[in-house]
Amino acid sequence: LLNEIAWTRVLIMVVGGSTYAFTLILLVFLLGIGLGSIIVARRSAPRAETAATAALAQGMTGVGAALLFVFFGLLPSYIIAVFQVPAWNAASRLVLMGVAVGAVVLIPAIGMGMTFPLLTDLTARSRTARGADVGSAYALNTIGSILGAVLTGFVLVVALGTQTTLRVGLVVNGLAALALAWLAARGVAEGSTEDRRLRVRVLSAAGLGTLALVAAAAAPGWSTRLIDLGPTIYARQPMDRVARQRFLEHRGVRQLAFREGANATVSVWEGESGRSLRVNGKVDGSDRGDMDTQVMLGLAPAVARAGATSALVIGYGTGVTAHVLATVPSVQRLKVVELEPAVVQMDSFFVGVNGSVLARPGVRVVIDDARSAFQLDRERYDVIVSEPSNPWVAGVATLYTPEFFRIARARLSDDGVFCQWIQLYQLPLPIVAGIVRSLHEVFPYVHVWFGGSADLVVLASPRPITYDRMWLTQLLGPGGQLKTLTREWLSIDNADQYFGRMLLGDSGVARLISRATLEHSDNQPRLEFVAARRFLDPGADAYVVFDSLIQLGRGDAGTSPFALLRILATRRSDAGVLPYLDAAHRAQPTVFEWSVRTAGIRLALGDTAQADSLLATVTGRSSGASPDALQMRGLLAAARNRPLAGMALREALAAGADTGQLRAALALLAARGASWAEAASQARGSLSVARGTFRHPYPGEFLSQALSQIALDAPAGLADSLLGYAVGRRPGSARYRELAAVAALRAGRCEDAAASFVELLDFAVQRDNGPALVRECWTTQDSTVRIGGGSRGAAARRVQEKH
């Protein structure tokens, strides 16, 4: 089982971790074993011939297993091609993925299927006790399978990794082939009839065995960047050749950590959009894009259960949800249940958003399956949060059944609140309704809240869910310990804004449940298969489902579509919000906020003309314009390089708008005018105050353009100092590192420029002319001619031309 387990761990990283993917790998493996057994069935041959055939089978197994090292680099490209044809459905894609799995699994599986009956025949003591011999062989095979599974899954993969484990398998197959070939040749007289009959088989087996050993030692491996692509998840959008290459290289992001645990492969990546946690190639949390959902999963149940003293979280992820619950002033005891230890080991990469929650007193981590942990636990909790991965991931759907919810309810205090995360992507409304119905079967009171752009936070309780505004103010109001988190990531300043995130109350949930078509239970786990098919053949748009939920919630007490829309528009680059903003503008044409928010998204998308026309009517009323409107006016003026842009930006600053964004635009204006000291001062100020949150995002194109001009044309020392500071503030930005290399070249700091070029390789950004430019820098340093901005400046510009 060593090969089978290692193959599975590698292949699910490419074909996805759904039940169908696991079934596909197992199907091909069993097919190969069956074919191998058929090939050698009902044969009776002398022992030497049996040994020679077994040697050939083991050699074929080893060489066939080595094909994974040859073909693996091609598999992601193949999977991308499979998902680039929209007309293909789930069944077609499964068949095509089966071809890929068969290419690397079928041949060695056939060899394994041949080996067992041959070795059973070979170890038989006589022809008269076949039953006992076969029984003994099966017993040994079963013991070996158990030991192989335990040793591989819990020791070899964890300690050595799958690549080395596969190489160990090649060594075993190669040595077995050579040993059996020697056994077949032993005692056979050279030149005899038997020798002539066995020679080709024995020599072939010895050659294949030797080739397997050579492959174990010398076969090129694959990079952890390549194995961590997740092509079935993230390569669905149309791609041209350049985009495909960028995807395959993970260009622009770097891998900070990679660990193969007993249950999953876990990694941490960093790029312009922050850090993300990947489990089996799928992002399961981040320090930016998922922050609203992660915060809301902790906040919503804490608000609904005022004064909660104990909480339990299923799934650690980045630790943000646990951090929110641990920060609630009344919580004294927090338990985190996490299946994969490697996830917890990645905690240190997210201390910026999880507040080192695991180091707090009263916080405890249990490494176990959620069901097992609940059944072994005798404590009760005021709040339980279940945030597993997507239901299409194999095994996860068991955490969405009524049976599991009953287990959770048994661990909940009488007035406790259970919180369930539901992902809207790739799940149509009837399936979402089915999950909520399963919850409602166990908990009579259910409310649905908005988590993120494609996430629901569902609250359930055995008693009516009530909300204490005084408790909410204590958490989020002035001096509240969650004020900063909720303000920056949820754009909540007061209680009314919090309740704007409510989607469905009691009556809305009743209407949603009436739409349910999915029956999912432990005995009939349909969700696992339905969700996996939807994953392979996506047809449900998250915003379509979200729109249906808004319609179902109309009229519920406490729900407000316009308040919810303000929250949706917090993500300023989300084009999916535009139809809702257009509808709001038609419904409330005198509310200029909708035009301002639309303009902000249009500007983020690069559509300055449309944004400009939207703002024309708003900013014409300068005396009554909001800080956001003034900010949009200033940013648009800067984007279009208008004469009074600087004045507009400073007016917005005085009104209290986003300092980071405005100072970035001022830096660009100063750089355009070659006012380098002013440009550097504004850029440094922008970097120093930027928070990278949804409310105060990192300055984007304005700051990048300003830094680019400063790196190329500002005084070398000034540019070098500023770009070094920029990299320190944004270590995940490959663009800033490239500009830092430019500035270092101009400043004559050749070694630092070389170091920056090397660091760029971690981001899959390679400058072919980098070594030559560094050598030129060193040559210039050694010369007696002072170049200043001459040769070094030209070298720096050649870096940009390559870009």
For the regions a protein language model found, what residue spans apply to each?
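Residue at a conserved register position within TPR or TPR-like alpha-solenoid repeats
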Residues: 568, 602, 637, 670, ...
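SAM/dcSAM-binding transferase cores
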Residues: 469-566
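Short coil turns that delineate tetratricopeptide repeat
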Residues: 589, 623-624, 657, 691-694, ...
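Alpha-helical transmembrane segments of multi-pass membrane proteins
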Residues: 1-474, 529-531
